[in-house]
Amino acid sequence: MQHKLLINGELVSGEGEKQPVYNPAMGDVLLEIAEASAEQVNAAVRAADAAFAEWGQTTPKARAECLLKLADVIEENGQVFAELESRNCGKPLHSAFNDEIPAIVDVFRFFAGAARCLNGLAAGEYLEGHTSMIRRDPLGVVASIAPWNYPLMMAAWKLAPALAAGNCVVLKPSEITPLTALKLAELAKDIFPAGVINVLFGRGKTVGDPLTGHPKVRMVSLTGSIATGEHIISHTAPSIKRTHMELGGKAPVIVFDDADIEAVVEGVRTFGYYNAGQDCTAACRIYAQKGIYDTLVEKLGAAVATLKSGSPDDESTELGPLSSLAHLERVSKAVEEAKATGHIKVITGGEKRKGNGYYYAPTLLAGALQDDAIVQKEVFGPVVSVTLFDNEEQVVNWANDSQYGLASSVWTKDVGRAHRVSARLQYGCTWVNTHFMLVSEMPHGGQKLSGYGKDMSLYGLEDYTVVRHVMVKH
């Protein structure tokens, strides 16, 4: 397995402390990788800064060609990437290969095209004898911090728009799941000029802090927890860096009495538990209207009970393990606290799986109240709660009564209600009669403590640019 860092176009071994990388399906160590040293972090940023002088002035066509080549290489090595992701994350291999790899390839191809469409406004004469124009220029060096739930996907979401806009990137994948990013580094080094892409390995304290705090870094892009986002914003405040934050969510799933209950059950069974629920948009916080509540709980409980946990290599496996032992304990603790309320009922699941690996049973909890922790706090595991509501006004208020604001869904046959409720929800995305549908052309990003900035779409590309005014006297 490729375990070297990419710095200035060369694969080099880390010079810092070695860290174990685990196989969560078995709970054993896959390998140990040496972190980047402080000197190597500095070297990576300096290399990116030096490369920016030329890369930032390349034509959109040239940048697009590099991105398309990278997309092709990922596609050609799709099986290799899927196997690495499966071993390092515990994802079912068939899901990694069939769902994630095509989406990752599409992200690079989308931004290759978008790079050639980015422009500033052609302005005019707002002062006699002077012509103004607006430019959208790259910022410089971008430090990108990727999470452990979708390691390669999130690396793509960060690399593609930043590079398309003309920036140079230093990427730090999670120390828990670095293998696909390091493999990507190996393939990218022969496509992009030296220094344009750099990939480091290490923990937040030893590598993340010196990277994000480096004076030559102009922007920091993070997908991670609220706590990590707070830390980076505070850490980078003295240098006034631009920050781009995607910090998780607790998606409300609003089910009205007139909803297609079979569609709701199928949707939540799939999108509440996909990737073992380790998804910031997971359909995890159901609000069911009183007329449909009992039926939904019964049917959804039966459906969730059929979800198959197992080996990532098994074609029939739907749920793999959680990412780490520490995360397994966090999920288990959240469910135990919910049980202890006395009014929350475990419909199915609610326990760790016996045997090797970090498995938690797919869980459905009914009877949750608005102020319960299981409703208000992100669990990030295969755990879905159901809360009863009376009317539209109440459920909109409850849905918005959350520190999160990333994703939501509304299930109803009433088109007017769908538009009305969607307009009032304080979430970056609202799906109607579906959930978890993502396309490269549409923006993904939240509000409130879920963060700010957009991934994907032309809005995502613009986030990696600076708007400049040029005035010419004539």
UniProtKB/Swiss-Prot annotation:
EC number: 1.2.1.19, 1.2.1.-
UniProt xrefs under InterPro entries: Ald_DH/histidinol_DH, Ald_DH_C, Ald_DH_CS_GLU, Ald_DH_N, Aldehyde_DH_dom, Aminobutyraldehyde_DH, PatD
One Pfam family recorded for the sequence: Aldedh
PROSITE patterns, per database record: ALDEHYDE_DEHYDR_GLU (PS00687)
Binding residues for NAD(+): A146, P147, W148, K172, P173, S174, E175, D209, S225, I226, A227, T228, C280
Domain of life: Bacteria
Enzyme class: oxidoreductase
Keywords tagged on the record: NAD, Oxidoreductase
GO biological process: L-lysine catabolic process; putrescine catabolic process
UniProt-recorded Gene Ontology molecular function terms: aminobutyraldehyde dehydrogenase (NAD+) activity; NAD binding
Pathway linked to the protein: Amine and polyamine degradation; putrescine degradation; 4-aminobutanoate from 4-aminobutanal: step 1/1; Amino-acid degradation
Reactions performed catalytically: 4-aminobutanal + NAD(+) + H2O = 4-aminobutanoate + NADH + 2 H(+); 5-aminopentanal + NAD(+) + H2O = 5-aminopentanoate + NADH + 2 H(+)
Job of this protein: Catalyzes the oxidation 4-aminobutanal (gamma-aminobutyraldehyde) to 4-aminobutanoate (gamma-aminobutyrate or GABA). This is the second step in one of two pathways for putrescine degradation, where putrescine is converted into 4-aminobutanoate via 4-aminobutanal. Also functions as a 5-aminopentanal dehydrogenase in a a L-lysine degradation pathway to succinate that proceeds via cadaverine, glutarate and L-2-hydroxyglutarate.
Assembly, per entry: Homotetramer.
Note: 4-aminobutanal can spontaneously cyclize to 1-pyrroline, and 5-aminopentanal to 1-piperideine.
Protein family according to the UniProt entry: Belongs to the aldehyde dehydrogenase family. Gamma-aminobutyraldehyde dehydrogenase subfamily.
Protein name: Gamma-aminobutyraldehyde dehydrogenase
